[in-house]
């Protein structure tokens, strides 16, 4: 994907260290744009960008945009950010990440993955299937793919596989040729006033798919299913464990290292087909659904069964999606990004289905006060497949609002509603001490959250 560009434009990314922003910045740099950026803290995403000779400043100050001609902001940037204020004073064009993403993929054949949960894994599975073909797509993902050790890759063809984030509504600007809607859940209510508003935006997005494209909608999800009658055209295929799905998942088998299933395909005007013994090196029915979405797209555009099965079987994974990080005294420790009740429940369901006899311990760090306030009851019900929960302090992500209830009472709600043993820790050192003194033998420990819990998990071997 190559575009001739005005070399005089300097594009500044405010909040360049985020996974979505860093991936977009990398693609634009490799396309030939003059890219720079800033963030308040350094991280691995920024280190990857520096290897591509992208200038990055660790601070937010108006001096950073002195030469910028275009500004791109992440959804995390507040109105009082000095760079955003200066950009407005200078009357520079200011784009949200989703708006800029839409601009750069406007001339490609786009497979756009949307939904509340499962976007990153689904995008990654699609990328793995495509990697076994002669097609060379551009990839823009919300997580780091182990196969390419990055969240983005500039391809040579006119295909683009991208994850579109619904958190600020900007995904509506992305032009889909094919779209996947994994599910719709109560999330980002600080932006959407209601579930009705969220659903209506998804309807608008699906209706943007052209006649020569297709949408793929998981009807295991009730909110997704509710959309079908409200779409303008029946230009979609359904998938899921519902036997009325066009891509019907059946004969599921879950082992400790992989999942296996058959997929019955029933498309209007076409001969029925079954792909048998699909092997996936991921746990959980949620990941079987994610892989089915990828298969549905691949089948529709004509990729062969053998290539599809090979792409899934040889999937290298994506960082922070149930990654095994170390083993200590026969206990396996995993890291996962789950930070919403639905995600926590699905991950634990998958772990329990594969590890029926092992004790499952979940280390949970809530992410954002607002999310915990909004979904307090749902969180308390989401740990039923665990045996033990270790509850960490809330990672506030800079929020300064009041919780509105005692944190100890939330812990009691988890014990009552999920029927687990629960322990609270104050920091990573107390966590390490607890693990050192109490956890050994054949157990599964999963750290969950979108804050610092991943770093805590990776530092545990040095502390225990």
UniProtKB/Swiss-Prot annotation:
It is an enzyme of class 6 (ligase). ATP binds at residues 115-121. Its EC number is 6.3.2.8. The keyword Cell wall biogenesis/degradation applies. One of its GO terms (cellular component) is cytoplasm. Transmembrane segments: none annotated. InterPro entries: Mur-like_cat_sf, Mur_ligase_C, Mur_ligase_C_dom_sf, Mur_ligase_cen, Mur_ligase_N, MurCDEF_pg_biosynth, UDP-N-AcMur_Ala_ligase_MurC. GO terms for biological process: cell division; cell wall organization; peptidoglycan biosynthetic process; regulation of cell shape. It is found in: Cytoplasm. GO terms for molecular function: ATP binding; UDP-N-acetylmuramate-L-alanine ligase activity. Cell wall formation. Belongs to the MurCDEF family. This is UDP-N-acetylmuramate--L-alanine ligase. It comes from Pelagibacter ubique (strain HTCC1062). The gene is murC.
């Amino acid at each position: 994907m190559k575009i001739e560009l005005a070399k005089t434009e300097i594009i500044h990314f405010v909040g360049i260290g985020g996974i979505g922003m860093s991936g977009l910045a990398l693609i634009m740099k490799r396309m030939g744009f003059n890219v720079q950026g800033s963030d308040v803290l350094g991280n691995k995403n920024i280190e990857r960008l520096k290897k591509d000779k992208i200038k990055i400043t660790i601070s937010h100050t108006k001096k950073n945009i002195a030469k910028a001609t275009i500004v791109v902001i992440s959804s995390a940037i507040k109105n009082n950010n000095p760079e955003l204020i200066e950009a407005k004073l200078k009357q520079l064009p200011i784009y949200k990440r989703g708006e800029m993403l839409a601009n750069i993929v406007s001339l490609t054949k786009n497979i756009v993955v949307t939904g509340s949960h499962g976007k990153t894994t689904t995008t990654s599975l699609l990328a793995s299937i495509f990697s076994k073909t002669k097609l060379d797509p551009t990839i823009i993902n919300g997580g780091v793919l182990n196969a390419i050790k990055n969240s983005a890759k500039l391809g040579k063809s006119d295909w683009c596989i991208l994850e579109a984030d619904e958190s600020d509504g900007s995904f509506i600007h992305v032009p889909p040729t094919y779209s996947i809607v994994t599910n719709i859940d109560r999330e980002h209510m600080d932006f959407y006033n209601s579930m009705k508003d969220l659903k209506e935006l998804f309807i608008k997005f699906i209706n943007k798919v052209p006649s020569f494209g297709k949408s793929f909608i998981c009807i295991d999800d009730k909110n997704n299913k509710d959309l079908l009658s409200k779409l303008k055209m029946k230009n979609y295929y359904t998938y899921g464990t519902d036997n009325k799905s066009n891509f019907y998942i059946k004969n599921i088998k879950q082992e400790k290292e992989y999942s296996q299933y058959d997929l019955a395909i029933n498309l209007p005007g076409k001969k029925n087909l079954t792909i048998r013994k699909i092997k996936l090196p991921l746990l959980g029915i949620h990941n079987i659904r994610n892989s089915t979405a990828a298969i549905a797209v691949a089948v529709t555009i004509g990729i062969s069964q053998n290539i599809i099965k090979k792409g899934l079987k040889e999937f290298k994974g994506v960082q922070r999606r149930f990654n095994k990080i170390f083993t200590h005294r026969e206990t396996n420790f995993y890291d996962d990004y789950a930070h919403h009740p639905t995600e926590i429940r699905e991950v634990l369901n998958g772990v329990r289905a594969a590890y029926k006899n092992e004790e499952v311990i979940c280390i949970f760090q809530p992410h954002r006060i607002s999310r915990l306030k909004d979904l307090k009851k749902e969180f308390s019900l989401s740990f039923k497949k665990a045996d033990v929960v270790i509850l960490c302090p809330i990672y506030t992500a800079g929020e300064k609002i009041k919780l509105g209830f005692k944190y100890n009472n939330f812990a009691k709600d988890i014990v009552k509603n999920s029927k687990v043993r629960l322990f609270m820790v104050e920091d990573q050192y107390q966590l390490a001490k607890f693990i050192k003194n109490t956890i050994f033998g054949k157990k599964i420990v999963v750290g969950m959250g979108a804050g610092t819990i991943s770093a805590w998990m990776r530092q545990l071997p040095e502390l225990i």
